[in-house]
Design a protein with these regions (language model features):
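Ferredoxin-reductase
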Residues: 2-82, 132-134, 157
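FNR/FR-type flavoprotein reductase catalytic core
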Residues: 69-220
Length: 220
């Protein structure tokens, strides 16, 4: 933690039963889609744990969105309250393709965090395909509803009425590729198995690897 910055949590929002978003004053500039490392004092994991920034670069508050998987870091962060402090690194990462092409985000769960930051900051046409257990596990509901992003939400574990962008079951990647502009750039984020599977299916549908950006989450 020698070169870490200390920030104070000023807001805590419970996104769903498993996911919490922590807000703190933005201590530096960053590019949409980047992440920071969070350090826990006294942890055996001295290198810390990386978390994507879920806020936009132009917002006063910076945020990270954490799913509680029962590990040391996620349990600690999801128990934080307003007034607690965090030790963080500066932002890094190159998930953002910095292109003017249409953007297509494909995310599962908290994999939406960096994709939301990029799509919300984009000026070009944007499309989002989001896999969630059910509507109750949706994250960033208010922000997505207020945005101009074309959102397609898939409930994988609970049958829902197919309205307000919701569909049942898992999405078919080949259908996504056929639905979006042919020159689109794809952003894929979620668990490693999810990212690997979606990447393989996008390329199998004829999309060149140079038009795909990926980022995988590891639970801790």
């Amino acid at each position: 933690m020698r070169d870490s910055l200390t920030v104070e949590i000023v807001r805590v929002r419970q996104e769903n039963p498993e996911v919490t978003t922590l807000y703190f004053e933005r201590p530096f500039d960053f590019m949409a889609g980047q992440y920071i490392t969070v350090f826990i004092e006294g942890s055996q994991v001295r290198e810390g744990k990386a978390y994507s920034i879920s806020s936009r670069p132009d917002e006063k508050l910076m945020s990270i969105t954490v799913k509680n998987v029962g590990g040391e870091f996620s349990s600690y962060l999801c128990s934080c309250q307003v007034g607690d402090t965090l030790h963080i690194s500066r932002a890094y990462g190159d998930f953002n393709p910095q292109t003017k092409q249409p953007l297509v985000g494909i995310a599962a769960g908290c994999g939406l965090s960096p994709i939301w930051s990029i799509l919300a900051d984009a000026k070009q046409p944007t499309f989002l395909y989001l896999s969630q257990k059910s509507p109750e596990y949706m994250v960033f509901s208010e922000e997505l509803a207020a945005s101009s992003i074309q959102v397609n939400k898939f409930s994988t574990r609970q049958q829902v009425e197919e309205k307000n962008g919701w569909r049942n079951g898992r999405f078919e990647v080949a259908n996504i590729v056929s639905e979006v502009p042919s020159n689109a750039h794809f952003l894929v984020c979620g668990s490693l198995p999810f990212v690997r599977d979606v990447w393989q299916k996008i390329t199998a549908a004829g999309v060149d690897e140079s038009h795909i950006s990926t980022e995988a989450f590891f639970e801790q």
